[in-house]
Amino acid sequence: MNLIEFPLLDQTSSNSVISTTLNDLSNWSRLSSLWPLLYGTSCCFIEFASLIGSRFDFDRYGLVPRSSPRQADLILTAGTVTMKMAPSLVRLYEQMPEPKYVIAMGACTITGGMFSTDSYSTVRGVDKLIPVDVYLPGCPPKPEAVIDALTKLRKKISREIVEDRTLSQNKKRCFTTSHKLYVRRSTHTGTYEQELLYQSPSTLDISSETFLKSKSPVPSYKLVN
């Protein structure tokens, strides 16, 4: 009985067979080709701009800034977002092709920052408008923190399923596609909260005993050091 003889492999050739799935291949191809749309409105964006220099060189991560949302798959929001800017931000996010990601950079973007204490025009968190993948706290965050956030985003991309991500985002849409904001009655009366303002004490609130005690003479030995 003759055995089937297989041709011997050349010892100088290397194995060139890769076993993977289409989803893993798609995730791997997007790890080093994130094209961000830079949405900077205040001082946090200055820290991100330092990444372009030769010291940090964010080109080594495959980041290519784009000016059009139709060519970007990552939007990086840095700074305060106001109510008037909210529809524009949502429109930019809707124009980005799937799959798309969001990094919220800085305290003003995540919570509204110090401007949301008594302001009627500040959005208290960009996640109320668009879904956020990575939160980057700080005021402002350092460039090293931005690189760490990009690394965490790449790890998240490497183990995700695109179909499940698309379905979950469609269920958590904050705005409709038509970008129509519902008109509500304004709760701003033009006056600030009086409890937050400093009010000088009136002379009527000071008791007469306290006033008389302050008028009493001070002994001479207490004036000597």
Curated annotation (Swiss-Prot):
One of its GO terms (cellular component) is chloroplast thylakoid membrane. The keyword Aminoacyl-tRNA synthetase does not apply. GO terms for biological process: aerobic respiration; electron transport coupled proton transport; photosynthesis, light reaction. Its cofactor is [4Fe-4S] cluster. It catalyses: a plastoquinone + NADH + (n+1) H(+)(in) = a plastoquinol + NAD(+) + n H(+)(out); a plastoquinone + NADPH + (n+1) H(+)(in) = a plastoquinol + NADP(+) + n H(+)(out). Pfam families: Oxidored_q6 (PF01058). Binds 1 [4Fe-4S] cluster. It comes from the Eukaryota. Keywords: 4Fe-4S, Chloroplast, Iron, Iron-sulfur, Membrane, Metal-binding, NAD, NADP, Plastid, Plastoquinone, Quinone, Thylakoid, Translocase, Transport. It is an enzyme of class 7 (translocase). Its EC number is 7.1.1.-. NDH is composed of at least 16 different subunits, 5 of which are encoded in the nucleus. Belongs to the complex I 20 kDa subunit family. NDH shuttles electrons from NAD(P)H:plastoquinone, via FMN and iron-sulfur (Fe-S) centers, to quinones in the photosynthetic chain and possibly in a chloroplast respiratory chain. The immediate electron acceptor for the enzyme in this species is believed to be plastoquinone. Couples the redox reaction to proton translocation, and thus conserves the redox energy in a proton gradient. This is NAD(P)H-quinone oxidoreductase subunit K, chloroplastic. It comes from Hordeum vulgare (Barley). The lineage of its organism: Eukaryota, Viridiplantae, Streptophyta, Embryophyta, Tracheophyta. The gene is ndhK.
